[in-house]
Amino acid sequence: FKYRLSLRDKNNKAKYIDIGKFNDRYFVYTASAGIFTKASYSAPQNIKNLLGHFAYVLEGVKDLTQVKRMKLKIENEDEVIEGEYIFVAICNATSIGGVMTIDEGKVDFADGLFELLLIKYPKDLIELGIIINELTNQIYDKHIRLLKVSKLKISDSSDIDWSLDGEKEDGRKNMKFRVIHNAVKLVY
């Protein structure tokens, strides 16, 4: 935790961090939907205790057989984005579930912005290979988008379930997100 917040070499200082508000619920780390997100709240606690991170990997493998497309309309301050996606995350973190990483230089825990990560639904195996390469190499291009946002409106053609910091949030067709800037004071 200390490492993730860049607190490793300091003592007795205070640092403020942003949190997110997703509809009526607050979260610190990530709100996500799509492939692999169900693993964060469906892996049994005793298995998580026994296997740690590997429990999430095992649970996530089940998702590979049921990849669903999400038809999303996302409105932020600068643009309207519409498309079919297999994954969406609104996060203030450099790692999402230990599976995906975002370059440390792109994330600031107290800038009033969260990162919006979108992964397009692949049309075929070739496009899937491109997406895997982009994920592995942290390339944000036409298949994977990374944007900084302070508020969003998200509309979905169906009610998709979300994971908020690993807890299930039942799906809705219309969702709102906003950053609460410098909401939490950490003393270290």
Please name every model-derived segment:
Residues 20, 39, 88, 116, ...:
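A residue-level signal for conserved active-site and pocket-lining positions in enzyme catalytic cores
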Residues 37-39, 82-84, 95-99, 124-127:
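Short acidic/glycine-rich loop or secondary-structure boundary segments that cap or lie
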Residues 32, 36, 89-105, 168:
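Glycine-rich phosphate/pyrophosphate-binding beta-alpha loops
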Residues 23-24, 31-37, 91-94, 120-122, ...:
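Glycine-rich beta-alpha junction loops
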Residues 1-86:
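Catalytic core of DAGKc-family lipid kinases
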Residues 73, 84, 89-91, 115-119:
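Short, conserved beta-strand edge motifs with alternating hydrophobic and charged residues
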Residues 47-55, 96, 105-124:
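Gly/Ser/Thr-rich active-site loops/lids in small-molecule metabolic enzymes
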